């Protein structure tokens, strides 16, 4: 049975606990419906009310939504705001200065607590130091850092002075970093000497140095280095400065720079189906509004909660639900440097027990790998830990299969914590379709219903609505405040990718297939409709990986597809033709290992193919088109049912069944 079939046949329903609903921000389906009705009746009024109630505006807005240059929508355009002010100063002014903002746990278990007052001072000193280096409003700053308080400080400091940050995940290669530095036109790079993961020190500064030698980065005048490990690193005088030195001697007071609501807060790169990563540009006002609204609605955040989102700041989840959302909500949160399996696979449960975490938000991939570990070793099974502080669980990054959902619900939530299975994307800025923990009856594997104000629908290839029970393409019918504004430097690609003419140019295309339940109308996400893979919740374009493989001097041709994987959700399977004869036996194993490392260096370790198969050539039609559906069947080990009569060389099918 496919994952989608198992969800569609899922009839178990779990109602919100009455005790949870009693104090929830949205306490019932009636309250949910009332908000949906308000948005349907007066869409602009609905968003304006929340924006005025929830955010501090340096200059109040009078315009709500400008659709005159659709699909380049503008929200609260004449208003002025500062994201850092809303996250830090406002909480200090409310009397929360002594409240813990961040509990940082390092890879080795060392714990550091930072209050809102201390965080504001750190951000202000570093922001003043950046200004002293000539970094100013409108400049772009790339951040290539480990999970750390300093990573959050760097992002908040950029927001404070009106510089646009672009965070690059610390697992990306020098080439990936260089591409992003060039594309966004960065004037500065903030990095660290090394990062700690699973007890090992891994280079960051060395990779950053390499990226800067690959060309096109002449605009980068300052490299600021956070000394995480104190490890020996190369130093370029006049360009390189330590983060400590930049902040040293600076004032604790750095007035927040008011920026227009549409000012780009950040650009975050995500994989596209054409190979070149897309710089997703987000606004300041609309983005921050939805980050805060979803903290209140989806996570039902309360003053005494201990919130923990296990994502990395290099991904959008770490932007919205670490750097901005929790701080805008005045919450206390965990920031974690390490990995879930070090020193053992009980690390997450141990941390929940020690820090009394009440809201836990992680990826299905992490859950699936920890299920395996728990079943293999009784000592680190979650039942050995006191998880009674938990009141809410969440999942993010990819759909969760009903079996993993049930394990999470029983073993971690002890059958008393609702699970918010959140569907959203880098491009949406925040949650789109998700249960509300005090209102929505839960069905394992379904992300249930759109949040109030989100006009999600399922359509066919022409943009027409399809009836419930029929699969189709997931779209959003109206613009919303936290949506992508454009692809950095490429407005045409933005239109083509997200507002295609085939759907009439007016519907936001999520790029996912979806289906709604006939009775409940609940949404289930079925996976990408384009050539984008979702591995451990990280999106990667097949073309990006193919290009990396083909850039190896021994590779003539490569095709990449995804196949289901019990742990990572989807695994990368590469079909490769070498410039010399097809390798077999030990030679094939050796070359496959070399190619994996090559891809790791070109893109980053997360892009390494799980299996590599060698053929004399690839299956193509007589017109020379690679038969990708056939490759998907081979990757999954399925019987070939496709018509192979147009196949140029049917003998290669047996070769391509052999995985290395």
From Swiss-Prot:
Keywords: Acetylation, ATP-binding, Ligase, Magnesium, Metal-binding, Nucleotide-binding. Acetylated. Deacetylation by the SIR2-homolog deacetylase activates the enzyme. CDD domains: ACS. It holds the Pfam family AMP-binding. Its EC number is 6.2.1.1. One of its GO terms (biological process) is acetyl-CoA biosynthetic process from acetate. It catalyses: acetate + ATP + CoA = acetyl-CoA + AMP + diphosphate. Its cofactor is Mg(2+). PROSITE patterns: AMP_BINDING. CoA binds at residues 197-200, 317, 536. Transmembrane segments: none annotated. ATP binds at residues 397-399, 421-426, 512, 528, 539. The modification N6-acetyllysine is found at residue 625. One of its GO terms (cellular component) is cytosol. GO terms for molecular function: acetate-CoA ligase activity; AMP binding; ATP binding; metal ion binding. Catalyzes the conversion of acetate into acetyl-CoA (AcCoA), an essential intermediate at the junction of anabolic and catabolic pathways. AcsA undergoes a two-step reaction. In the first half reaction, AcsA combines acetate with ATP to form acetyl-adenylate (AcAMP) intermediate. In the second half reaction, it can then transfer the acetyl group from AcAMP to the sulfhydryl group of CoA, forming the product AcCoA. Belongs to the ATP-dependent AMP-binding enzyme family. This is Acetyl-coenzyme A synthetase.
């Amino acid at each position: 049975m496919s994952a989608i079939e198992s969800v569609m046949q899922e009839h178990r329903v779990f109602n919100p606990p009455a005790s949870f609903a009693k104090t929830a921000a949205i306490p019932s389906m009636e309250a949910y419906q009332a908000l949906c009705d308000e948005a349907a009746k007066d869409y602009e009024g609905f968003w304006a009310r929340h924006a005025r109630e929830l955010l501090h505006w340096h200059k109040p807005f009078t315009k709500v939504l400008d659709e005159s240059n659709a699909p380049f929508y503008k929200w609260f355009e004449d208003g002025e705001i500062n994201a850092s002010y809303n996250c830090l100063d406002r909480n200090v002014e409310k009397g929360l200065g002594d409240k813990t903002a961040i509990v940082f746990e390092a890879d080795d278990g060392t714990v550091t607590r930072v209050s809102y007052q201390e965080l504001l001072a750190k951000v202000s000193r570093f922001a003043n130091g950046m200004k002293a280096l000539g970094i100013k409003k409108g400049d772009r700053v790339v951040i290539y850092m480990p999970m750390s308080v300093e990573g959050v400080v760097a992002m908040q400091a950029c927001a404070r002075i009106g510089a646009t940050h672009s965070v690059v995940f610390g697992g990306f290669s020098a080439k990936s970093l260089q591409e992003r530095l060039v594309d966004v036109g960065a004037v500065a790079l903030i990095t660290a000497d090394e990062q700690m993961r699973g007890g090992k020190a891994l280079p960051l500064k060395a990779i950053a140095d390499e990226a800067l030698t690959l060309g096109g980065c002449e605009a980068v005048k300052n490299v600021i280095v956070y000394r995480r490990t104190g490890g020996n690193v190369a130093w370029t005088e006049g360009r390189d400065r330590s983060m400590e030195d930049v902040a040293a001697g600076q004032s604790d007071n750095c007035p927040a720079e008011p920026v227009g609501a549409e000012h780009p807060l950040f650009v975050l790169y995500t994989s596209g189906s054409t190979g070149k990563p897309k710089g997703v540009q987000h606004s300041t006002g609309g983005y921050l509004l939805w980050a805060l609204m979803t903290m209140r609605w989806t996570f039902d955040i309360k003053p005494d909660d201990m919130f923990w989102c296990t994502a990395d700041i290099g991904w959008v989840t770490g932007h919205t639900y670490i750097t901005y959302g929790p701080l805008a909500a005045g919450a206390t949160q965990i920031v974690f440097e390490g990995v879930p399996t070090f020193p053992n696979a009980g690390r997450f449960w141990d941390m929940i027990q020690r820090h009394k975490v009440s809201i836990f938000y992680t990826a299905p991939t992490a859950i699936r790998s920890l299920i395996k570990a728990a079943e293999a070793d009784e000592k680190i099974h979650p039942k050995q830990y006191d998880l009674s502080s938990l009141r809410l669980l969440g999942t993010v990054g990819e759909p969760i299969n009903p079996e993993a959902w049930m394990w999470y619900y029983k073993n971690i939530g002890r059958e008393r914590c609702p699970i918010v299975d959140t569907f959203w994307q880098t491009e949406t800025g925040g949650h789109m379709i998700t249960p509300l923990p005090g209102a929505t009856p839960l069905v394992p594997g379904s992300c249930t219903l759109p949040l109030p104000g989100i006009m999600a629908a399922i359509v066919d290839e022409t943009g027409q609505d399809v009836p419930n029970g029929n699969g189709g393409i997931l779209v959003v019918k109206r613009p919303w405040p936290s949506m992508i504004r454009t692809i950095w430097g490429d407005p045409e690609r933005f239109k083509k990718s997200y507002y295609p003419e085939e759907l009439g140019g007016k519907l936001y295309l999520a790029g996912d297939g979806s289906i709604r339940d006939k009775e409940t109308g609940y949404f289930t996400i079925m996976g990408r409709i384009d050539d984008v893979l979702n591995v451990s919740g990280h999106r990667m374009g097949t073309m990006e990986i193919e290009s990396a493989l083909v850039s190896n001097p021994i590779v003539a041709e490569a095709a990449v597809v995804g196949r289901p994987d019990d742990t990572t959700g989807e695994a990368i399977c590469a079909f490769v033709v070498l410039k010399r004869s097809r390798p077999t036996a030990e030679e094939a194993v050796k070359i496959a290992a070399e190619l994996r490392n090559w891809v790791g260096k070109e893109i980053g370790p997360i892009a390494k193919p799980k299996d590599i198969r060698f053929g004399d050539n690839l299956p193509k039609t007589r017109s020379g088109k690679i038969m990708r559906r056939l490759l998907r069947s081979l990757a999954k080990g399925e019987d070939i049912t496709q018509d192979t009569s147009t196949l140029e060389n049917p003998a290669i099918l047996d070769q391509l069944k052999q995985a290395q």
